[in-house]
Regions:
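A generic beta-sheet turn/junction motif
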Residues: 11, 20, 221-223
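Residues immediately within or flanking Cys/His clusters that coordinate Zn2+
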Residues: 4-6, 24
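Long, acidic/polar, low-complexity amphipathic helices and coiled-coil-like
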Residues: 17, 23-25, 62-63, 67
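Cys/His-rich microdomains that often coordinate metals
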Residues: 16, 34
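Short Cys/His-rich "knuckle" micro-motifs
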Residues: 19-22, 37-41
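Charged, low-complexity helical/coil segments in non-catalytic cytosolic or luminal regions
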Residues: 43-225, 237, 242-250
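A charge-rich, low-complexity, intrinsically flexible signal that marks solvent-exposed coils, linkers
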Residues: 230-232
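Short cysteine-rich clusters marking metal-coordination/redox-active sites
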Residues: 9-12, 27-30
Length: 250
């Protein structure tokens, strides 16, 4: 962890703390969002999702998750000890885009092989975690965009952590394009065996900077520590470790 640094909020004058590498920061006193390098106002939409669960309710969600499914040990909910419940508002860029790919390739699953052409057209609200080192299963997180509101620091719980962005808008859009192209290439390879040529065109409709409430839960079971991620906006389990004796991670 680097040394915490500060700039002054140009709106209220309060100190805004940030870590080295963070490029967008939000004042915890007035909710003003600034670009760290310049101290200037952040000009893009800054939204948030509301957390709907307190620590006691989160524990109930965790116990319910432990009881579900045949992969988990039958005594997990009864014997597991929840050791940590941390609410973190993670920063994301949500890139809304239409993507259309045209491809041509060789289909070798029949004899003789034939040349096939096809198209893939999809719409996405593509999620880019705005942190470089934080591990989070973004592809498994169904962000409930219908619940987003303008960022309001008064809605953030006193015990919660709010992480700032380490990735700017242009980098996020570039990553989204790259990842969508990779997904479309994968989908094309379900239809053909060798790609001869492929072209993807994208139309971006909006890019939103969003803070989402994620509960990072740790629990102990038979002497080992496991982690579960809970969506604070919906109560859904995003991803959780299952103790050995089950069959892995879901």
């Amino acid at each position: 962890m680097g040394v915490v640094q500060e700039i002054r909020c140009s709106h209220c004058g309060a100190p805004i703390s940030f870590q080295p590498g963070e490029i967008i920061a939000t004042c915890k006193y007035c909710g003003y969002t600034v670009v760290v390098e310049t101290g200037q106002t952040f000009t893009f939409e800054h939204s948030m999702l509301l957390n709907k669960y307190d620590p006691t309710q989160v524990e109930e969600l965790v116990r319910d998750w432990m009881r579900e499914g045949f992969l988990k040990p039958p005594d997990l909910a009864r014997k597991a000890k929840i050791t940590e419940k941390t609410l973190i508002y993670l920063p994301f860029w949500v890139v809304s885009a239409k993507a259309e790919s045209s491809y041509k390739g060789i289909f070798e699953r029949i004899t003789p092989a034939i040349v096939k052409e096809g198209k893939i057209a999809k719409e996405y609200d593509w999620l880019i975690l705005a942190r470089k080192a934080t591990e989070f299963p973004a592809r498994e997180y169904e962000v409930p965009l219908e619940g987003k509101i303008p960022f309001d620091f008064r809605k953030v719980e006193a015990f919660a952590k709010v992480l700032n962005s380490e990735i700017d808008k242009n980098d996020a859009v570039g990553l989204a394009k790259q990842q969508i192209e990779e997904i479309h290439r994968y989908l094309a390879q379900q239809d053909i065996d060798k790609i001869i040529e492929m072209k993807t065109e994208m139309e971006m409709s909006q890019v939103v900077y969003l803070h989402a409430p994620i509960w990072f839960v740790k629990y102990e079971y038979k002497g080992k520590i496991y982690q579960l991620l809970i969506d604070g906006a919906t109560g859904a389990a995003i991803k959780g470790d299952i103790p050995s004796g089950g069959f892995g991670i879901i």
